[in-house]
Amino acid sequence: MKKMILSALLALSVNMAMAQGDVLQTATMKRDLTAKVNEQVYFPETVPPGNYSGITWLGGSLYAVVSDKSKRDGFFIFHINIDPDTGQISHAYSNEFRGEDYACRDNEGIAFVAQDSTIFISGETGNRILEYRLDNGHRTGRELAVPDSFRQSRPNLGFESLSYNPVTRRFWTVSESVLPMDGEACTQKNKKQNNLRLLCFDENLQFVAEYPYLMDYPVLKSKTANGYAMGVADVCALDDGRVIVLERELSVPKMKLGSFVNCKLYVVDPSEEGYSVALHKKLLTQFKTVIKGVKNDFANYEGMCLGPKLNDGSQVLVMICDSQDQKANVLHDYLRTVIIK
């Protein structure tokens, strides 16, 4: 009997070692990603002025886009042509809206679930993430089961982001800024690192996990900005379980000159262990747009999604900005791509 027990324990230890080896091998297979940021472009003759805040790929050249100030609840259909070799956007147009006669919920994030032919949209009004039919934009009556404690956000600082990955079958979202139950939020007069909660939901729309995420310290030195925002604008779920997080800092002085938007794309791996305070972050890339002298490429990027793969196998990340309806005829509805290898 003792020999049988010892043999069983030995076999169990071998199996555990093999399993641990598999885990380690899987972790090492997640190689570091690199990125190239393409030039931003805009198409004023074919893309109407908007407050575009989220984007998701439907396949081919089709994308669904949400606006946080659309007249009705629903989404726009965009056609975006991308060069298969460079990933640069060559043309884009939008001439269709799908939705119904409900008021807009300050729609911010959007995700496509192909197996169900449905769209999920996060709205900061009520902090609910509702499901819509792709063919007509009507609500299905289903929504992600967000715990009440995570819906209690500061005004206009709720669920700005949303992503779904068909391989992992997981939804991801995070509040734009710190939840009241977690303390103070970063402002131009109270500079601090925002401590956020990255939330995960399964394909049955149920909440499954939360992960601590700590933003960078702001780069703005002044405390007198006329307009300021510091938070996570969007997330993008990758096939290997990692998540790209868009940290966005925006500053607009009273005289407008010197305005900037600083965007940082970080990669986090929720499956990693060993973190003490928050998930480990790896900077993928960063870029800055400004209004400075004669230069004006100011773009408040709020949405991003995975797009097609290029001929060389590189992954395209598509980004869209909020021009506030091309405010003062100065801002533009920019699109841009980031090529990930």
Language-model features, listed with the residues they occupy:
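Bacterial Sec-dependent N-terminal signal peptides
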Residues: 1-25
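Sequence/structural signature of beta-propeller domains
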Residues: 20-341
